[in-house]
Design a protein with these regions (language model features):
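N-terminal, positively charged regions that mediate nucleic acid binding
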Residues: 1-58
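A short glycine/serine-rich beta->alpha loop
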Residues: 10-15, 118-130, 227-231, 288-291, ...
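Glycine-rich anion/phosphate-binding loop at the beta-strand->alpha-helix junction
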Residues: 14-20, 135, 210-327
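Alpha-helical support elements that line or immediately flank enzyme active sites
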Residues: 20-32, 128-150, 235-243, 299-301, ...
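Glycine-rich, N-terminal phosphate-binding loop and its surrounding beta-alpha-beta segment
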Residues: 43-109
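Short acidic, glycine/tyrosine-flanked loop/strand segments centered on an H-E-D-like triad
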Residues: 98-124, 319-338
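Glycine-rich, mobile lid/loop segments that gate access to catalytic sites or pores
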Residues: 113-230
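Internal helix-turn-beta structural module
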Residues: 312-380
Length: 380
């Protein structure tokens, strides 16, 4: 099992849904980087369940304990160990269905790989609960990126068949204004168009009342990345962002910029024309989402991820009793989200921050953290 992402800047995660704690170790941060625990807490709060019919009744405090690597609000340059206690656990909910494979979950694949030694309580290490560690570690990196002039944010582009206003892919100024609006809001329901919030919430609650669930699409924007970050082929910007994006449970698809829409365009329509804006090279359009040949060109990076409906539903399903080796009906117990899309928005933001932080460190070393306002002028 590989629990580490990143090479120049790496996060290792640990824990299970119903274990004593979950957490991570962030390695590669320079010494002297400010760490705002209030900012980390705010990110965690956007992910936290509220027991409001829109998310799981399992409400956790999600207080992040920084065990090492941070003193007096600054990094020491050593590994940052962080831990989040699991305090609201009801493992008994899973006892009656322990031998039944839950459709859409990793029960069967985990059994095939780990031969019954996996922790199956609440999904164990496969649970979305583990994304709390991604948010905690990613928030530290996101704070450092923000100080270097790089902003990352995510909104709910679509949920339960209802769409929000999309990001302005071809208008960098309008996109920056949209990002500013989203970052100014503290609530965990990230939308640009406030008029679709109640219809979305109503649809989520309706699915939950029927014992069902719904999915959606998240849209993430990355502003301020300098040109020249990334590698061709295997460590391309798309490759590393996708690597992290698919590490968020329930994500089943991704596209950058115009994405699958390229299939219906001609080359004359798909190419982004270059032009000068002062001393900077920009593109007239941004179909390619700020990436050419796996390397950033300085334009905004925009990508969308498809999030499947929560697989834990309360409707009876057909499955298999893998101990008795026979077909069986399944009625899931426990506490589950009717939709994880709203809570997953901050997870995708922090996942992207980890990928971008690794890319930036591979390109600039730790200079972007140590000298966030001047590293671009140093000719690195």
């Amino acid at each position: 099992m590989k629990n580490t992402f990143g090479s120049a800047l790496a996060l290792t995660i640990f824990g299970e849904s119903h274990g004593r704690a979950i957490g991570g170790v962030l390695d590669g941060m320079a010494a002297g980087v400010p760490v705002d625990e209030g900012f980390i807490a705010a990110c965690m709060d956007k992910r936290r369940a509220r027991g409001d019919g829109l998310s799981t009744p399992r409400v956790e405090a999600d207080n992040v304990q920084l065990l090492s690597g941070v003193v007096n609000g600054h990094t020491t340059g050593t590994a940052i160990a962080l831990m989040i206690e699991n305090q609201n656990i009801r493992s008994g909910d899973y006892a009656k269905t322990a031998d039944l494979l839950r459709p859409g979950h990793a029960d069967y694949t985990a059994y095939a790989k780990y031969h019954g030694f996996q922790d199956a309580r609440g999904g164990g290490h496969f649970s979305g609960r583990i994304t709390a560690a991604l948010v905690a570690g990613g928030a530290i990196v996101l704070g450092a990126l923000n100080r270097a002039g790089i902003d990352i944010t995510t909104h709910i582009a679509r949920c339960a068949g209802i769409s929000d206003t999309p990001f302005a892919l071809d208008d960098a100024a309008a996109l920056a204004a949209q990002v500013s609006v989203l970052e100014s809001r503290d609530e965990g329901f990230a939308l640009l168009d406030a008029s679709v919030e109640e219809p979305m919430k109503t649809a989520i609650r309706a699915a939950g009342s029927e014992g069902d669930s719904v999915g959606g699409i998240l849209e993430t924007a990355i502003l301020g990345l300098p040109a020249g970050v990334g590698e061709p082929y295997f460590d391309s910007v798309e490759s590393l962002i996708s690597h992290m994006a698919f590490s968020v449970p329930a994500v089943k698809g991704i596209e950058f910029g115009t994405g699958f829409g390229f299939a219906d365009l001609k080359g004359s329509e798909a190419n982004d024309a270059f032009r000068m804006k002062g001393d900077s090279v920009v593109t007239a359009t941004n179909h390619n989402a700020g990436i050419n040949g796996g390397i950033t060109n300085g334009m905004p990076v925009v990508f969308r991820t498809a999030v499947k409906p929560t697989p834990s539903i309360y409707k009876e399903q057909e499955t298999v009793d893998y101990i008795a080796k026979q077909d069986a009906p399944l009625s899931i117990q426990g506490r589950h989200d009717p939709c994880i899309v709203p809570r997953a928005a901050i997870v995708q933001t922090c996942a992207a921050a980890l990928a971008v932080g690794d890319l930036m460190t591979a390109r600039y070393g730790t200079a972007w953290m140590e000298r966030p306002t001047s590293y671009r002028r140093e000719g690195l």
